Amino acid sequence: EELEHEVQTHERCGKEVEYSVMKQWFIDIMNHKEDFLKIGNEIKWHPEHMHNRYDEWVNNVAWDWCISRQRYFGVPFPVWYCKDCGEPIFAKMEDLPVNPLVDSPKVDKCPKCGCSQFVPETDVMDTWATSSVTPLINMRYGEKDNYESFLKPMSLRTNASEIIRTWDFYTIVKSFYHFGQRPWDNVMISGFVMANKGEKISKSKGNSKVEPIDLINQYSADGIRYWAGSGRLGTDIVFSEETLLRGKKLINKIWNVSKFIEMHLADYEDKEFNDYEYIDKWILGSFQEMEKGFVKYLDEYEVGLALNHLEKFFWNFCDNYIEIVKHRLYRPEEFGDIPRYSGQKTVYTILYKLLQDFSIFFPFITEEIYQELYRDNKSIHLTEIKPLQFNFAKEIKNGDKIIDIISQARGEKSNNNLSLKTPIKVLELNVNEDLKEAINSSVKDFKATLFIEDLLLNNTNDDFKINKIELDLESK
């Protein structure tokens, strides 16, 4: 009798798919849900709310885990069955790996009925049944006699949110059954890459026309990593060529500023030095504070925030500090050899530290520059990131205000469609005592940066105010 009924079809090719009832292999889930919840509580989830997804899955799972599949590919079950009574014959651990379709069991007859003929298991394991043993593989489980004594939780598992219920959960299941403990200390969950409208990237939607190799050729591998590393923890990231372009611009700037610094290090010899100029103390102290936040973000697995934090400092370094110190580097006869060396030492130190921090995101360009300028180790990726140890809190505070004054004065030039090199005939400032001392300590740098002819500083209790700025309009 022919019956007409609805069946599911494959989403791509439309082929009908029907389920057949067959014997399968299962792992017991239902009797240990509380154990799996307990292990989940022992793990730190990043972001924390992703732990809720794990708990919801464990609490709501309603059946045991079927680990067998009827496919042509996969890891085979190391099992045979007695042809007469069906008794399963399992391979011993020392005999693994085996393929029962081509290998025979290491027994002559069935221990139950004595039959000497065996039928191989034809099923293969589910994807998650094999990928869930990754911690054991990393610890070379089964390859050493004392494997139980050296298995410890891994520090970190990284994956996207959709496989919390599969890869994460089933790895926890395996770890529980093997060792009764958590497989890792931390889980870092990423989001998905989405198309511009927040849609899933799919050929059928026509929103995935860009080939990866073309993107690499256009923006570089480091540029792709900039885009990939800019996302927030646990949050979807939109594919954006604008972000790729920003990454390319940043990488080009890293290269260009490195070449500028290299040009001024031709006669530089690295040695102990503490007689830094005021503005050098400002940038060194600012980097030290920035790197504390940078490391904090990394410790929290907020890679995107760490990159953004580092990038903001880099542009401040280029747009402000380099513009100030370049006069000292170019004109030692005017500024003096020691102030010039202070600038050399500072750019040498800051660039080295920037390359170390950026190397996490841009391994290729940072290695290229490192090999050209430093080479105190085989690779920048083998160097140890050590925090700077300065006490420049006062210089940071007042240095930021000096930069603010410089920015306002430059803005005045731009508003008048003047070159930034336009001389300032008179700059009159109201400043408090601390800032006055700071400006006087860096007066050569300050005046050279703004091309100031006459600088007047008046006392005030406030931070600062520009009273008068007289531009040389004849040089327009």
List the predicted regions and their residue ranges:
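Flexible, glycine/threonine-enriched loop-and-boundary segments that flank and lead into catalytic domains
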Residues: 63-68, 94-125, 169, 173, ...
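NTP/phosphate- and nucleic-acid-binding module
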Residues: 1-46, 70, 85, 115, ...
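Acidic, turn-prone loop/beta-hairpin segments
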Residues: 118, 195, 268-295, 323-408, ...
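Secondary-structure capping and boundary motifs in well-ordered enzyme cores
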Residues: 117-129, 148-165, 215-219, 243-253, ...
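Residue-level signal for inorganic ion chemistry
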Residues: 14, 190-191, 254, 317, ...
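Secondary-structure transition/capping motifs at alpha-helix termini
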Residues: 1, 109-119, 142-151, 175-186, ...
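Residue patterns forming the tRNA-binding/recognition surfaces of aminoacyl-tRNA synthetases
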Residues: 1-84, 167, 199, 207-250, ...
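Alpha-helical recognition segments enriched in aromatics with Gly/Pro capping
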Residues: 71-73, 78-79, 92-236
